[in-house]
């Protein structure tokens, strides 16, 4: 994503970012003197016409791209094909690039993943990741699919930024491609189950995809605000990410990753968080 932003975004260029978003995208745009324009979306807009109106409201003559994440990090929302077709048409009409973050494409539990790339191949850059698909975050291997000329420019940026992905990681990625389908299928079912259980404990709808839950904890915030809430969670042995890192409108929210630990340990952390949020969650009975 660093390479794709550096390839096309110049100083002063604006990028529409559907929020809440992956925490690093805003900073990447800013790193190259671009202007991230947040569009509060995934948690509140469920009508397509309203979505298009929100984009029109925030676009300007400096806007060059629209960043879309589906399945969404951090909400777990999966956008349907007709919404993506409408976004593609919006991008054509407004002459924008589409930056399509699809790193959780293999982890859809309800509905189906639809890629933006086939809908607007001439103006879409799709980002994919072995880190998420195959549990290989430490290997730092991913790829993008883009129009040929655009990809050639991104390759130049990559060469002069990190030169190339580490060879051991590339070999591991090749092995994953050759024999990782069963692992993905098994992991998807495990993630689906733990995500649904975590959501139920927190009184939330089960996520449609990704590996996150995004929670409004405003009712639990006292005089110390979110910082105090995070400190209390830490004392409980639970780490969650502050929602403000995913958008300016989300200062009273937190992001939970329910796959950061084995399922039973993750669910115990969720139980502690649920109790911190005022939910009546009894402890798990000890085995006799």
Question: Residue ranges of each PLM-predicted region?
Answer:
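PLP-dependent enzyme catalytic core of the Aspartate aminotransferase-like
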Residues: 53-57, 223-224, 235-241, 246-288
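Conserved core segment of the aminotransferase class I/II
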Residues: 122-192, 277
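Phosphate-binding glycine-rich loop
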Residues: 1-14
């Amino acid at each position: 994503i660093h390479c794709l932003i550096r390839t096309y975004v110049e100083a002063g260029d604006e990028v529409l970012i559907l929020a809440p978003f992956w925490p690093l995208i805003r900073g990447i745009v800013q790193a190259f003197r671009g202007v991230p324009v947040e569009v509060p979306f995934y948690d509140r807009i469920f009508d397509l016409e309203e979505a298009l109106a929100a984009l029109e409201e925030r676009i300007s003559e400096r806007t060059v791209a629209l960043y879309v994440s589906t399945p969404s990090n951090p909400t777990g929302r999966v956008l349907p094909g007709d919404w993506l077709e409408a976004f593609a048409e919006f991008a054509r009409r407004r002459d924008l690039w589409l930056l399509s973050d699809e790193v959780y494409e293999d982890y859809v539990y309800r509905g189906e993943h639809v890629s933006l790339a086939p809908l607007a191949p001439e103006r879409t850059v799709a980002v994919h990741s072995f880190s998420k698909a195959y549990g290989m975050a430490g290997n730092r291997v991913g790829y993008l699919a883009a129009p040929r000329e655009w990809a050639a420019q991104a390759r130049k940026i990559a060469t002069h930024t990190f030169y190339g992905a580490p060879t051991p990681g590339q070999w591991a990625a090749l092995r994953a491609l050759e024999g990782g389908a069963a692992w993905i299928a098994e992991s998807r079912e495990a993630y689906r189950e733990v995500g649904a259980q975590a959501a139920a404990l927190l009184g939330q709808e089960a996520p449609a995809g990704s590996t996150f839950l995004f929670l409004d904890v405003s009712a639990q915030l006292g005089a110390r605000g979110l910082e105090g809430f995070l400190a209390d969670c830490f004392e409980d042995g639970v780490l969650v990410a502050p929602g403000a890192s995913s958008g300016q409108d989300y200062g009273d929210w937190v992001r939970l990753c329910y796959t950061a630990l084995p399922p039973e340990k993750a669910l115990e952390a969720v139980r502690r968080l649920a109790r911190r949020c005022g939910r009546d969650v009894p402890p798990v009975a000890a085995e006799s």
